[in-house]
Amino acid sequence: KLWRKNIVGIVILIASDERIEKFRHPVPTEKKVKKSVMVVLGARKYGLIVSLTRIVHFGKLPEDLKRKHFAVCKVDTALISSTKKGKTIGEVFSEGIKTYRITGYPDEWQKHHQGGPTGYMTRYYRATKKINEIIKENYAFAWNPSITGTKSEDTIITNEENQIIITEDKNWPLLRIETEKGEFLRPDILIK
């Protein structure tokens, strides 16, 4: 379907079942899906790249996975809602780390990079708390926080006031995450 829309998949990572817990950037294998599948996509059109991650689960979703996914969506929401014109990338990164702690997963951020600025590359660099680059209008970011077994990722663009999620799909189930900055919608796990 991507090719028919002149979209080139430049990063296509897929894991199923226990491989989702083992690999945050999973190289596809021939392993068959039993209960869950995670698809990570980096796609290019007109030279620009977007990134997103989606998870599908077959059958009843385990409570532990539901809890972890809600927590990682809260971290993603903290990163997205903090990505504003005038803030530094380090300040945004620190908000994400703080939210990992608040949600009860203080060390998970150390197990994989959190994403960063994007555009003509999947990431120009990986964000850290030491980066003092000031965010400006029309900057694109793809944050990708993860907690063992789950991940949340979309691509956003900053505007004058806040940010626009450009990879959001209203047909995908969404979690409503309430923050002091308002309500944010994050991709839930699709149950089949």
Locations of regions flagged by a protein language model:
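Active-site neighborhoods and metal-handling regions in enzymes and metal-associated proteins
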Residues: K1-K192
